[in-house]
């Protein structure tokens, strides 16, 4: 049998982490609907709790179904380990809290999902963690100027939501590493099929597995994947939570116990997940595994449809601008070809010439596109970010994040593209009538 490390992406998305059940011989991954697990002996129990060996203790911390999902995500991203959580928001929260605490500072791009912006700006502030937002993530000097002695990490999205801008991962990673901190990236829109951030210098990847990885709009989940390359033990003073004895875990030092490649992800599991409890249900983990098994097939169709619709919208007189890095007119077109040669995903946004009222009429007039707060479904979706996903932000913060009053965001599904165009055409006609009436 070929070695798993030699498998291509399409094989890994089906087989990594899974094997026939040793007792029942069932081929599909079972749903292990249990709270806890029998120890072989007192010594076995003690070893598990002391991190002397790995295994299942309690489903709040780990579950065999969850483990298959984690191994598969780690394989697809090329990481050393993964932790799956109850939501993408939990993943972003854990990714920061795992190495930052009261009195610390983080640096983030401002071109991020509105929920993440709100988490960083307001909730982390209540916990004593300060954030500096980089308004132009393409400027390495702005990242460099934001560094402080108490900075613990850089954060950005590989493909920004909703600007669909491409992060120069290598450049930002270099600035982060020169400052002694890791780069954490959200790879939700791209998925590892389009961009593998570890190959470009990123250290930690987070996902809303809810979106394109799960792909069917049925299940909430999040994930953190550790690239295993950041040398925590060489930054003892900056990351004492990983390098010094943890009094809440038998005085263990995570870097000493499991080494730099696994210290971050093990700490997130046995300390944060143990204490905060954002565990994913076994049924949810199983649902997400089913989605991942068709990831490459779906993403190819998603990208094909999105590219065609972006080009179609870009050629229309009633559309003021289109944000999609797969268009030659995009300022990130060159970076898209460098980092995402197979395509830049299925999320795009555009501004109607009629402004906010035209945008509202457009959304209300669609029938095939579903008006809801999600992306990454096989079904095509639409939303008005300024009044929904980014509504918690001030008008100034919205503009910094690339959200204008009349912006409309599409998540393009895998339906027939001509049917999607017909639906968009009818809605654009309705929006045009509103604009003409306003001018009359």
Language model features by range: what are they?
Residues 54, 80, 284, 288, ...:
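Short amphipathic alpha-helical segments
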Residues 2-3, 13-22, 82-315, 323:
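Conserved PLP-enzyme active-site core in the AAT-like
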Residues 2-63, 71-72:
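N-terminal "arm"/small-domain region of PLP-dependent enzymes with the aminotransferase-like
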Residues 36, 227-230, 352-355:
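Short loop segments at secondary-structure junctions
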Residues 41-93, 115-123:
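Conserved N-terminal alpha-helix of the aminotransferase class I/II PLP-enzyme fold
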Residues 39, 138-142, 330-331:
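A short acidic, often aromatic-flanked loop/helix-cap motif at beta-alpha or helix-coil junctions
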Residues 277, 299, 307, 311-408, ...:
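Conserved C-terminal alpha-helix-loop-beta "cap" of PLP-dependent enzymes
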Residues 2, 121-122, 130-131, 152, ...:
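PLP-dependent enzyme catalytic core of the Aspartate aminotransferase-like
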């Amino acid at each position: 049998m070929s070695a798993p490390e030699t498998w291509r992406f399409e094989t890994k998305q089906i087989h990594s982490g899974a094997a026939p059940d040793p007792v029942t011989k069932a081929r599909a991954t079972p749903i292990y609907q249990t709270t806890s697990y029998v120890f072989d002996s007192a010594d076995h129990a003690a070893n598990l709790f002391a991190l002397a060996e790995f295994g299942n203790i309690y489903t709040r911390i780990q579950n065999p179904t969850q483990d298959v999902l984690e191994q598969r995500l780690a394989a697809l991203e090329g990481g050393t380990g993964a932790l799956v959580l109850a939501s993408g928001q939990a993943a972003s929260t854990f990714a920061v809290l795992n190495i930052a605490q009261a009195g610390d500072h983080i640096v983030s791009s401002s071109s991020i999902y509105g929920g993440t912006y709100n988490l960083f700006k307001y909730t982390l502030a209540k916990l004593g963690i300060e954030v500096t937002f980089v308004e132009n993530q393409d400027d390495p000097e702005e990242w460099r100027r934001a560094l402080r002695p108490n900075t613990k990490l850089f954060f950005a999205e590989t493909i920004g939501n909703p600007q669909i801008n491409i992060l120069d991962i290598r450049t930002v990673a270099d600035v982060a590493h020169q400052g002694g901190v890791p780069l954490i990236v959200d790879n939700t829109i791209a998925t590892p099929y389009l961009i593998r951030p570890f190959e470009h210098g990123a250290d930690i990847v987070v996902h809303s597995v809810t979106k394109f990885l799960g792909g069917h709009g049925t299940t909430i989940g999040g994930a953190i994947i550790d690239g295993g390359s950041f040398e925590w033990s060489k930054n003892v003073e900056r990351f004492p939570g990983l390098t010094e004895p943890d009094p809440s875990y038998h005085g263990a030092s995570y870097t000493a116990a499991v080494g730099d490649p696994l210290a971050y992800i093990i700490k997130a599991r046995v300390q944060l997940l143990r204490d905060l409890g954002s565990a994913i249900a076994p049924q949810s983990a199983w649902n997400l595994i089913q989605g991942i098994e068709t990831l490459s097939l779906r993403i190819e169709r998603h990208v094909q449809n999105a590219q065609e619709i972006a080009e179609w919208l870009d050629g229309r007189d009633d559309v003021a601008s289109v944000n999609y890095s797969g268009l030659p007119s995009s300022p990130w077109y060159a970076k898209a070809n460098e980092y995402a040669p197979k395509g830049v995903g299925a999320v795009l946004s555009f501004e109607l010439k009629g402004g906010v009222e035209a945008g509202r009429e457009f959304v209300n007039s669609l029938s095939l596109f579903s008006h809801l707060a999600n992306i990454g479904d096989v079904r095509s979706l639409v939303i008005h970010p300024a009044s929904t996903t980014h509504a918690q932000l001030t008008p100034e913060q919205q503009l910094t994040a690339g959200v204008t009053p009349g912006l409309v965001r599409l998540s393009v599904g895998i339906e027939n593209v001509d049917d999607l165009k017909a639906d968009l055409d009818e809605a654009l006609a309705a929006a045009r009538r509103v604009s003409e009436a306003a001018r009359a």
